[in-house]
Amino acid sequence: MPKILCLHGYGTSASILQHQLGPFMAAADPSYEFVFLEGEIECQKAQGLGPFVKGPFLCYNESFAPADIQESCDLIDEMIQAAGPFDGIIGFSQGGSVALSYLLQRQIDGHPPPFRWAVFFSTVIAFAPNDTFGSNILANLTDHEIRLLDGYPATDLSSLHPLTRALCETTAQTFYSAKTGGFISPNTPIAEFSKRDDPSQPRVFHPALLGDRIPIPTVHITGRKDNSLMVGLSVLVQGLCDQRLIRSLTHSGGHNVPRSADDVRAAWAAVDWAIQHSQKQHIW
């Protein structure tokens, strides 16, 4: 029986994701088992949820500091030990970010992935769970560079070194997009570049900053009506995956999972492709 681990978005819950994925799961092979990983931290209600949706509203991490990201990754390990093994992993929004962080850090550490394939719905950038990632860039930020970064998005960052832009501008853009779009709480701790290489400093996984790639088939699905900056981040993280093993598509909605019949059919066609290609691999 194929088993799939599912991670929800910020400000929702396992039960809410189960409802969101209703049409998608209804179209699945009846033998598939969907297992939902619940976040452990209460937070504000996610943007776009109807007034009658009841909490608790949960997330996987309160901040994007490496230690908090590691705790989120630990939840996946604990679920694998308790209910695994799993064939695939599905992540929506923040859940996709956590899944990406987990898979990429395992690849960096030289461990084989515990999943054969992955699906990312409207995911956002992945953050490093290791506080040594990007240290050489953060530790050497000049006062001038810090002033430019603190002024984002009003300042011109074109003068920054390409790798500094990859790490720091992407971090600044992520927080700006997420906060202005209402995708995370206004009280979420942001990157403070004046701290330079402080262990609490968030560090984004950017394709330009590392050579490791997620080695399993991945499917990336965004909404045509989603926030354009958030879609840009979803596209960026595709660069963290093996380009030979990617399928990407767009559904007709916004920051959500596919729900119309046509969108669900297209999503499953991509997932079936990923499953078929995963069976040809020998990395386990």
From Swiss-Prot:
Instruction: Report the top EC class in one word.
Output: hydrolase
Catalytic site positions? 93 (charge relay system), 226 (charge relay system), 255 (charge relay system)
Q: Tell me where on the tree of life, at the top rank, the source sits.
A: Eukaryota
> What's a GO biological-process term for it?
secondary metabolic process
Task: Enumerate the SUPFAM superfamilies for this protein.
Answer: alpha/beta-Hydrolases (SSF53474)
Q: What happens when the gene is disrupted?
A: Fully eliminates the production of asperlin.
- Would you identify the family this protein belongs to, as annotated? Belongs to the LovG family.
Task: Please identify the protein, giving its name as recorded.
Answer: Esterase alnB
Q: Which organism is it from?
A: Emericella nidulans (strain FGSC A4 / ATCC 38163 / CBS 112.46 / NRRL 194 / M139)
Gene this protein is translated from: alnB
